[in-house]
């Protein structure tokens, strides 16, 4: 909460935000994961953050996880987690397979509550449908990227991850107001676009996503 600023070094990208986790917090998180490993058959670690990697990205719509979050995900797997799920951002992020374990840095929102009563209280009931959609998307830009998500299904054989199947969903961006926030399988063209975007976002970790129809498949060797 007390940021410091300095001139970027040669290897750094201007505008990059660097965070430092509290050592005690990190220690407790990893300790709890190790305890869960001893008590459970399958451990999923999750962390809710909004931080972005760059000042150029809005926090809730940051498509690239900051460095400390990637480090946390790796340490969570090393401590015994079978999977790591990032929450907090309202858009999609990339996917990494780390030591044979899936890391989902951001799958988007599975559903969203439409708080129309708040608009009525604030005197915004006369907004046009397009204006309500922009407000509902909460993306400060009017597009519907934050209304697109993924359902990920991981397949295992003999305890080892063999593949992850990705099913694109959307929250009623092109339907009536009554469907806003309700998840449904994305149409083929939308599914293709969503999967291609996630594929690009996953490039930095070398994750290959095969797109077969409206499904993305990550095959783990």
Predicted regions and their residues:
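Acidic, metal/ion-coordinating pockets
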Residues: 1-221
């Amino acid at each position: 909460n007390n940021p410091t600023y300095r001139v970027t070094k040669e290897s750094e990208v201007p505008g990059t935000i660097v965070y430092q986790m509290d050592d005690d917090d990190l220690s407790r998180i990893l300790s709890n994961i190790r305890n869960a490993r001893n008590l459970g058959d399958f451990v999923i670690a999750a962390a809710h953050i909004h931080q972005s990697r760059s000042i150029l990205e809005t926090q809730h719509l940051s498509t690239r996880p900051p460095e400390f979050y990637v480090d946390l995900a790796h340490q969570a797997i090393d401590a015994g987690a079978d999977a790591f799920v990032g929450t907090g951002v309202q858009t999609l992020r990339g996917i990494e397979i780390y030591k044979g374990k899936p890391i989902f840095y951001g799958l988007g929102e599975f559903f969203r509550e439409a708080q129309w009563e708040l608009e009525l209280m604030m005197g915004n009931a006369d907004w046009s449908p397009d204006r309500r959609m922009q407000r509902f998307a909460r993306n400060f830009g009017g597009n519907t990227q934050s209304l697109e998500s993924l359902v990920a299904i991981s397949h295992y054989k003999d305890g080892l991850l063999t593949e992850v199947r990705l099913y694109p969903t959307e929250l009623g961006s092109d339907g009536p107001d009554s469907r806003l926030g309700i998840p449904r399988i994305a149409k083929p063209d939308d599914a293709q676009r969503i999967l291609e975007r996630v594929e690009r976002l996953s490039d930095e970790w070398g994750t290959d996503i095969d797109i077969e129809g409206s499904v993305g498949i990550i095959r783990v060797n």
